Amino acid sequence: MKHLIKQIGVTALLISTIACKEQKKENEANVLPDPTVVENSVAIPDTWITNRVKKAKERLTASSAGTVIWKSMEAHGGLATWFENGPLGMRFNYQPLEKDKTQRDSYEIVDPWNNRVVHTSTTDKEATFGYTGEIAWIKADSTAFAYDTKFWALTPLYLMGHPFVEDGEGVNLELLPDATYKDKNTKVVKVTYDAGTGDAPDDYYILHFDAETYLLMATRYIVSYPEYFKDGGHNPEKFMEVGELVDVAGVLLPSLLKTHWTVDGMPGEYITKIEISDMEFVSELPEDFFEMPEGAKKL
């Protein structure tokens, strides 16, 4: 550094430094970050999280149904903590009890801020599929995943991520009458979606929250994915019991989900066991982690 100063002179160096700083300030003033999308990065600025959480609180607490959702978010650890922790890694093992149904078992890392995900087979680490936020892809042979990976990419998040996944745009909330479940009074909120929201906007969820703690106890839902129901319609409603909640870096998440057919608003025949394990928030990932890898096939 001393040698450099001797070469160019102290005055010239100071002029250059000041000019660079002024140019940097000018450039920074002209660049306004998008507060909702981070391209090719897993790190979310704290100010963006604060802004998104503030807007979510204002929107949700403006209605009685939204207030229940907000209170549940707080009870489960808070929307800010959910986003601050970064992408969530977990093994999601979906095990139908019916013999003709396909098990879906993968380790995934999902980015709830941008709805991006990468799944890896639990038996072949080279077999992967995912969603970039825009493109669904797969990199595996034809036998690795015997199910619709495009449909399944973000499905686990929407089965286990309530109430946090209700913060987005296009979400409609309706407060239904209280109901009794497992001898407890529950607050009940129905979630629907605007047309054009996601691949299956006709889906709905009916969420049962403990009226005292606001922790999620059960989820009723339908599947209306157009590739499965080309003429419209949906499957019969399912009733999903929420099992033990575990603390993952300050966020309470389910380790077990038990799915039944719904009968008169309550659980009927038990049809699917879902075990969620190895949950951890992953703070350090390559910037291109959620991009479609070389050699992958676009779905």
Language-model regions: role of each:
Residues T186-E291:
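Gly/Pro-enriched, hydrophobic low-complexity segments
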Residues M1-G9:
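Bacterial N-terminal signal peptides that target proteins for export
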Residues T61-A65, G130-D203, E227-G233, L285, ...:
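Flexible, processing/modification-adjacent segments and terminal tails
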Residues S16-A19:
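C-terminal motif of bacterial Sec signal peptides marking the signal peptidase cleavage site
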Residues D34-V37, N51-A144, N172-T180:
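N-terminal mature ectodomain segment of secretory-pathway/periplasmic proteins
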Residues K21-Q23:
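Bacterial signal peptide processing site
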Residues L13-L14, K25-K54:
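Compositionally biased, proline/threonine/alanine/serine-rich low-complexity intrinsically disordered stretches
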Residues N85-P87, G168, K184, L252:
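Extracytoplasmic
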